[in-house]
Amino acid sequence: MEPVDPRLEPWKHPGSQPKTACTTCYCKKCCFHCQVCFITKALGISYGRKKRRQRRRA
């Protein structure tokens, strides 16, 4: 790897962000788009609010 300028913030390092924006698509290409897409789409991990399940009526 190339040395990174220590004066740059971590989020401004070259290659730290993909050139295209993230989408809501779940195809294989979009699931491996970036690290965030992989964690949320491919692994299904989200730390947001959980939706309440409705109980089945008998």
UniProtKB/Swiss-Prot annotation:
Report if keyword RNA-binding is assigned. yes
Q: Which GO terms describe its molecular function?
A: metal ion binding; RNA binding; RNA-binding transcription regulator activity
Annotated region (Interaction with the host capping enzyme RNGTT), positions in chain: 49-58
What InterPro entries does its record include? IV_Tat (IPR001831), Tat_dom_sf (IPR036963)
Locate the region Core: 38-48
Residues where Asymmetric dimethylarginine occurs?
A: 52-53
N6-acetyllysine occurs at which residues?
Answer: 28, 50-51
- Which portions of the sequence form the region Cysteine-rich? 22-37
Region Transactivation, as annotated, extends over 1-48
Top-level division of the source organism's lineage: Viruses
For the site Essential for Tat's translocation through the endosomal membrane, which positions are given?
11
| Keyword set, alphabetical order | Acetylation, Activator, AIDS, Apoptosis, Host cytoplasm, Host nucleus, Host-virus interaction, Metal-binding, Methylation, Phosphoprotein, RNA-binding, Secreted, Transcription, Transcription regulation, Ubl conjugation, Zinc
- Gene3D superfamilies this protein is in? Tat domain (4.10.20.10)
Keyword Secreted, does the record have it?
Answer: yes
Assembly, per entry:
Interacts with host CCNT1. Associates with the P-TEFb complex composed at least of Tat, P-TEFb (CDK9 and CCNT1), TAR RNA, RNA Pol II. Recruits the HATs CREBBP, TAF1/TFIID, EP300, PCAF and GCN5L2. Interacts with host KAT5/Tip60; this interaction targets the latter to degradation. Interacts with the host deacetylase SIRT1. Interacts with host capping enzyme RNGTT; this interaction stimulates RNGTT. Binds to host KDR, and to the host integrins ITGAV/ITGB3 and ITGA5/ITGB1. Interacts with host KPNB1/importin beta-1 without previous binding to KPNA1/importin alpha-1. Interacts with EIF2AK2.
Q: What is this protein called?
A: Protein Tat
